[in-house]
């Protein structure tokens, strides 16, 4: 097929040079033999010297999108328009213009458990809305959009196991967010060496001293609001923010030397292979209530096993559809079970190796983006 693809290659803008979606959405399409014309949002921003998602970006990108698509469509008609866009990226009018040219349109989205509001406006204009979280179909139908379940996966030609000795007992790659600090603290307090890589585990550079003072000022503000707010709900909310702030501040001392700034994509892949155990967390804050957490699957559930890493994360029924619990991926229900299983598999290396290998076989055999795309195109009768 001839496919027009547009996306931002990064899955996390706080990680300089991240090309996560380039590796997972673009490269597998090429690998399958499709002809792909790629329009990268980061390159559009660079070309016009504007900030991605700044005030000018949406209008500029919409113009570039229509111009590029029309130009390439004139050269040779497309079989599919495929995008990873949200409401902040593109004007609805641009999508309508492309739709008028008669090319099937598909948009991919994820994080819809807590960020569905980001795609509510544009979704009805696509023929197919590919969602990674299984239950997002209900939300999409409610706004008149056509849902197609397109689960997360990983590209085995990028997430390649590396040989060598283990560098870390336990590692976590991701931001200090939601209940992650709580779980990490529980492990550290019980003597587990945990290395964390990602945003907010350390005070971000540059201007660390200034940012530290700003955070302390915010803490005082939260404390006053927790003490004097007339709303019990607000008092609870700001008390919780102070608790997590103090917990992380204390962890930076008790776990000194094991918190790290965000790492590159290549470093991340290496960490997955060189950690005895990789931790993941499915929990995110609720879209409507920041005091409540919900669960959804991430790329990590497929990246780590693809790198032949031993992976432990929260139990979920949806995850159990992809991996057999405690035989291909280790799953926990609470902090006590997490600690118990981490201790067990650090001590029982043969058992750990069996799960590591089984998880790799399942990921590489069933959960590749090459297989996801092949199944998707067969389902949509696109070849």
Model-identified regions with their sequence ranges:
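A conserved, positively charged/aromatic
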Residues: 118-129
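Short N-terminal targeting/anchoring amphipathic segment
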Residues: 72-88
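Nucleotide-sugar donor-binding catalytic core of glycosyltransferases
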Residues: 1-52, 85, 90-93, 128-319
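Structural alpha-helical scaffold elements that stabilize or flank donor/cofactor-binding regions
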Residues: 74, 121-122, 271
């Amino acid at each position: 097929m001839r496919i027009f693809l547009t996306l931002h290659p990064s899955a996390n803008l706080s990680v300089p040079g991240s090309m996560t979606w380039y590796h997972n959405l673009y490269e597998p399409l090429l690998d399958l033999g499709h002809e792909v014309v790629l329009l990268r949002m980061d390159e559009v921003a660079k070309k016009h010297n504007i900030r991605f998602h700044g005030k000018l970006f949406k209008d500029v990108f919409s113009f570039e999108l229509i111009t590029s698509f029309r130009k390439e469509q004139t050269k040779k008609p497309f079989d599919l328009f495929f995008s990873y866009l949200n409401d902040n990226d593109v004007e609805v009018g641009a999508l309508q213009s492309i739709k008028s040219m008669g090319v099937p349109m598909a948009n991919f989205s994820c994080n819809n458990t807590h960020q569905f509001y980001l795609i509510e406006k544009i979704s009805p204009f696509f023929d197919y809305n590919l969602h990674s979280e299984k239950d997002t179909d209900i939300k999409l139908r409610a706004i008149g959009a056509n849902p197609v379940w397109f689960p997360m996966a990983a590209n085995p030609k990028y997430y390649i196991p590396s040989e060598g000795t283990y560098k870390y007992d336990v590692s976590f790659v991701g931001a200090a967010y939601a209940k992650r600090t709580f779980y990490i603290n529980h492990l550290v307090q019980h003597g587990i060496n945990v290395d964390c890589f990602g945003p907010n585990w350390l005070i971000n550079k540059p201007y660390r001293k200034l940012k530290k003072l700003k955070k302390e000022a915010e803490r005082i503000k939260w404390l006053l609001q927790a003490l004097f707010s007339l709303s019990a709900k607000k008092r609870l909310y700001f008390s919780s923010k102070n608790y997590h702030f103090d917990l992380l501040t204390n962890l930076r001392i008790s776990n000194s030397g094991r918190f790290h700034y965000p790492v590159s994509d290549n470093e991340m892949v290496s960490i997955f292979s060189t950690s005895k155990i990789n931790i993941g967390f499915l929990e995110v804050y609720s879209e409507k209530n920041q005091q409540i957490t919900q669960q959804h699957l991430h790329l990590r559930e497929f990246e780590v096993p693809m790198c032949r890493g031993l992976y432990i994360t929260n139990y979920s029924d949806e995850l159990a559809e992809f991996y057999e619990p405690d035989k291909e991926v280790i799953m926990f229900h609470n902090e006590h079970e997490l600690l118990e299983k981490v201790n067990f598999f650090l001590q029982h290396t043969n058992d750990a190796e069996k799960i590591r290998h089984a998880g790799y076989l399942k990921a590489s055999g069933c959960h590749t983006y090459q297989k996801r795309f092949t199944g998707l195109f067969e389902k949509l009768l696109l070849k």
